[in-house]
Amino acid sequence: MARSTRAKQRLRKGRKKVNQDHLSVKKLTVAAVLMAMNIIMSISALSIPVPGGHMYLNDLIIVTAAILLEPFYALLVGGVGAFIGDMLFYPAPMFVSLVSHGLQALVISLFVHRWMKSRPVPASVIGAAVGLVISVTGYTLGRAYIYSTPAYAAAKFPFQILQTLVGSALALLLCWKCGVVKLYEREFKRG
């Protein structure tokens, strides 16, 4: 009798481990797809020309990833995805992108998944607002340093705010009004 009970317990532990591994693979796959989308959004052909450069829609993907994914995965999608995109298409600000978008995604995800877990919609809005400040500040300081001209950074400043604001607003609408969060959660509850 004791042997069969132990065998059942081992079997349950084994099933639980398989399910956890399956979830990890699924989360990694979602993160990889979002990272690929982030890289693709770095193409200048998909951007809007503005004085001082281009306005990209990366923030839509970064904020969406941060709302859906745990902080580690969000950091990878935001920071590493933007870094690779810049490295492939315009390498000068790639380290600025790594830090700015990485911190932006990390902070949003921490608000949603750790600090205000019981209230995800307000957490997303607050996180996106804080992420906007991080991204805009990081890019403004980074551009001033990289290009050695604060005037260049100042010229791009309002468009950087607009880029992050539009991307964040679209991500919030996509996640909460269009049901992406519910779809994502339903898929992961199913295992």
Which residues does each predicted region cover?
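Loop-helix junctions at membrane interfaces
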Residues: 1-191
